[in-house]
Amino acid sequence: MEMDKRMKSLAMTAFFGELSTLDIMALIMSIFKRHPNNTIFSVDKDGQFMIDFEYDNYKASQYLDLTLTPISGDECKTHASSIAEQLACVDIIKEDISEYIKTTPRLKRFIKKYRNRSDTRISRDTEKLKIALAKGIDYEYIKDAC
């Protein structure tokens, strides 16, 4: 399965800055009924720990345009509490995905927009994003415009 362009467009426009890789994993499970093939412990450019989820041809972080660096076994000790916290969240999500989505307002909003927004509107938002990024316009402004 390839990365879903509609989902990427919504994540980068209307939901920019609101979603995490855990949210993307939950959305993929809910919308596409797919579980990740692999879990990757990573850090972002600021050194913040994040779990990334690998699927067939893409990672959850790609939906958010995040560049994550996998951490080594030795570095896992440094991030042990964050790893435990996020793995607990993963277990909660996997245990009852429907309930998790229902109790998370931004994910409910995302799914509603994903299902109800026309392909034309999403394509238009994606086009706005490309033009704005080419001109160096901030994501926050793009989010407000979409």
From Swiss-Prot:
Record bears the keyword Transmembrane helix: yes
Induction: Expressed in the late phase of the viral replicative cycle.
Record field: transmembrane: 10-32
InterPro entries: Poxvirus_H7 (IPR006872)
Recorded coiled-coil stretches: none
Membrane topology: Single-pass membrane protein
Signal sequence range: none
Biological role: Contributes to the formation of crescents and immature virions (IV). Interacts with phosphatidylinositol-3-phosphate (PI3P) and phosphatidylinositol-4-phosphate (PI4P) lipids in order to form virion membranes. Mechanistically, mediates proper formation of OPG125-hexamers, and hence the honey comb lattice and spherical immature virus.
Family membership: Belongs to the orthopoxvirus OPG112 family.
Name assigned to this protein: Late protein OPG112
Species per Swiss-Prot/TrEMBL record: Vaccinia virus (strain Western Reserve) (VACV)
Taxonomy of the source species: Viruses, Varidnaviria, Bamfordvirae, Nucleocytoviricota, Pokkesviricetes
Gene: OPG112
